[in-house]
Amino acid sequence: MGQERLDNANPTLFDSKPRHRPVTGTERDESVEDPIDSWEIFDLIRDINDPEHPYTLEQLNVVQEELIKVFIDEEETFVKVNFTPTIPHCSMATLIGLAIRVKLLRSLHPKVKVSVSITPGSHSTEESINRQLADKERVAAAMENQGLMHAVNECLRVPE
């Protein structure tokens, strides 16, 4: 958004999923613990804005519920999100991954472990970007960088 040269000047747009899923009886029962699932994670990240286009990551099919896995055991919850850049040489892939990670870190309980990575085979430098996104120290340093956090916050900004 706001760049002069776009990596993908004409992205394909996809239909959005319905906002609400059917609610089961146990989900209405406040006495039953309702563990987090892939749909809830998808719902948290679907409206993240693309850094280049006036569309959401869902509209561009960058994030998909099918690429989100939630693992829960008695000790911890682990969320793994794969995302698919619109083109294999997308220069914004690291920023998109960071925006997803920051959104989840801000939204989920601190005990939930989060992993964000590029869908295998979908980016020319996926290995390098995945290493950056998995490095807690690099992510923490990025979150302290005002310019980078401004870009991330623009991605996370709710449209008016």
Curated annotation (Swiss-Prot):
Q: Which Pfam families does the protein's record reference? A: FeS_assembly_P
Q: Where is this region: Disordered?
A: 1-32
What biological-process terms (Gene Ontology) are attached? chromosome segregation; protein maturation
Entry keyword set: Chromosome partition
Would you say which domain of life the source belongs to? Eukaryota
The answer to whether keyword Ubl conjugation applies is no
Q: Which SUPFAM superfamilies match?
A: Fe-S cluster assembly (FSCA) domain-like
Q: Which InterPro entries match?
A: FSCA_dom_sf, MIP18, MIP18-like
* One GO CC term, this protein: cytosolic [4Fe-4S] assembly targeting complex
Q: Describe the family membership recorded for this protein in Swiss-Prot or TrEMBL.
A: Belongs to the MIP18 family.
Function of the protein: May play a role in chromosome segregation through establishment of sister chromatid cohesion.
Q: Which protein, by its recorded name, is this?
A: MIP18 family protein F45G2.10
Q: Which organism is it from?
A: Caenorhabditis elegans
